[in-house]
UniProtKB/Swiss-Prot annotation:
The lineage of its organism: Bacteria, Pseudomonadati, Pseudomonadota, Gammaproteobacteria, Enterobacterales. GO terms for cellular component: cytoplasm; cytosol; ribose phosphate diphosphokinase complex. It comes from Escherichia coli (strain K12). Belongs to the ribose-phosphate pyrophosphokinase family. Class I subfamily. The gene is prs. This enzyme uses a steady state ordered mechanism, where Mg(2+) binds first, followed by Mg-ATP and lastly, ribose 5-phosphate. Changing D220E: 4-fold decrease in the affinity binding for Rib-5-P in the presence of magnesium ions. In the presence of cobalt ions, it shows a 15-fold decrease in the affinity binding for Rib-5-P. Mg(2+) 1 binds at H131. This is Ribose-phosphate pyrophosphokinase. Optimum pH is 9.7-9.8. Coiled coil: none annotated.
Length: 315
C-alpha cells in the first residue's frame, strides 16, 4: 500500500494540523508562499514518488489565492510523481455559482473550478456540505461530499433544549432541516419564507409552523454576512420563540457579519472549522466553533485504505 502523506496550504493550517494529529502523523514538508510579485510559490521538500497524497486546503477568502495555492501544489506533487492526489477541500468556494440564471449572461463558475482541478491532476476530491450536491457531477473524478450534520447534531443534543423545533431559513434548506429534525428525536420543523431583493440582502416574510414558547434551532450549510440569519431570529422571537440557536457548517462571515451577529437576538451561533475565524468573530460571546478534524481524518483514512465513506453516515 502506498505511503499516505498529508500536505496543507495556508487556508486552514489549524484544521490541517488537527487532522494530522488525529491520524498520528505530521504534515508534509512543503514551502507554500509568494514570490515578490505576488505569484504563488510552492516547493515540495520531501520524496512523494508513488505516495497517496492528500492536500488540505479550503478555497475560502481570499478565494482566488487559496485556489491557486491548491492547484499549484497539485501540479508540484504531480510533477514529483505522486501516486494519487486527493484534494481535501473542507469549504468549496464558488459553489454558489452553480447554475446560469435564466436570461442572465453569467458563468457557471463551480464548473470552471471543477475543470481546473481535474486538469492539473487531482484524482479525487473530498469536501464537506457542498452548497449544491449536484456540483459533484461537474467533476470528471470521484467526489466524496461528507456531512457536518453528525457533529452539529451531537452538539445540539447537549443543549438541553426545551420543546425544540428545527427551522429551515429558506425553502431550499428543507431537506437538510428535515434530516436534522428526524435525528433530533423526530422533532417538529418550521420553514421561513423570505424574498431576496439582491445578493446578501433578504427580507423575512412569514414563518410556516408554530414556534411560540419553543427553542428554535436554525440549520444551514453556511453563514455569509449573517443578515438572513439575524432577520430570521428576529422573526422567530417576534412570534414567541423562547431561544434561538443557529447551526451552520461553513462560517464565511463576510462583510458586516461581525456587527450583525453582535447586535443579533440569536442566543448562540455554532459553526465548524472549515474556514478560520477572524479575531473579531472569535471575540463574540455568542459564537462557538466545533471541529470536523475527527470526521475528516476518518474519511481520509478510509479513502487511503479503499474503505466505504458512505458507511460513516449510516444510522
Amino acid at each position: 500500500m502506498p505511503d499516505m502523506k498529508l500536505f496543507a496550504g495556508n487556508a486552514t493550517p489549524e484544521l490541517a494540523q488537527r487532522i494530522a494529529n488525529r491520524l498520528y502523523t505530521s504534515l508534509g514538508d512543503a514551502a507554500v508562499g509568494r514570490f515578490s510579485d505576488g505569484e504563488v510559490s510552492v516547493q515540495i521538500n520531501e520524496n512523494v514518488r508513488g505516495g497517496d497524497i492528500f492536500i488540505i486546503q479550503s478555497t475560502c477568502a481570499p478565494t482566488n489565492d487559496n485556489l491557486m495555492e491548491l492547484v499549484v501544489m497539485v501540479d508540484a506533487l504531480r510533477r514529483a510523481s505522486a501516486g494519487r492526489i486527493t484534494a481535501v477541500i473542507p469549504y468549496f468556494g464558488y459553489a454558489r455559482q452553480d447554475r446560469r440564471v435564466r436570461s442572465a449572461r453569467v458563468p457557471i463558475t463551480a464548473k470552471v473550478v471543477a475543470d481546473f482541478l481535474s486538469s492539473v491532476g487531482v484524482d479525487r476530491v473530498l469536501t464537506v456540505d457542498l452548497h449544491a450536491e449536484q456540483i459533484q457531477g461537474f467533476f470528471d473524478v470521484p467526489v466524496d461530499n461528507v456531512f457536518g450534520s453528525p457533529i452539529l447534531l451531537e452538539d445540539m443534543l447537549q443543549l438541553n433544549l426545551d420543546n425544540p423545533i428545527v427551522v429551515s431559513p429558506d425553502i431550499g434548506g428543507v431537506v437538510r432541516a428535515r434530516a436534522i429534525a428526524k435525528l433530533l428525536n423526530d422533532t417538529d420543523m418550521a420553514i421561513i419564507d423570505k424574498r431576496r431583493p439582491r445578493a446578501n440582502v433578504s427580507q423575512v416574510m412569514h414563518i410556516i409552523g408554530d414556534v411560540a414558547g419553543r427553542d428554535c434551532v436554525l440549520v444551514d450549510d453556511m453563514i455569509d454576512t449573517g443578515g438572513t440569519l439575524c432577520k430570521a431570529a428576529e422573526a422567530l422571537k417576534e412570534r414567541g420563540a423562547k431561544r434561538v440557536f443557529a447551526y451552520a457548517t461553513h462560517p464565511i462571515f463576510s462583510g458586516n457579519a461581525a456587527n450583525n451577529l453582535r447586535n443579533s437576538v440569536i442566543d448562540e451561533v455554532v459553526v465548524c472549522d472549515t474556514i478560520p475565524l477572524s479575531d473579531e468573530i472569535k471575540s463574540l460571546p455568542n459564537v462557538r466553533t466545533l471541529t470536523l478534524s475527527g470526521m475528516l481524518a476518518e474519511a481520509i483514512r478510509r479513502i487511503s485504505n479503499e474503505e466505504s465513506i458512505s458507511a460513516m453516515f449510516e444510522h
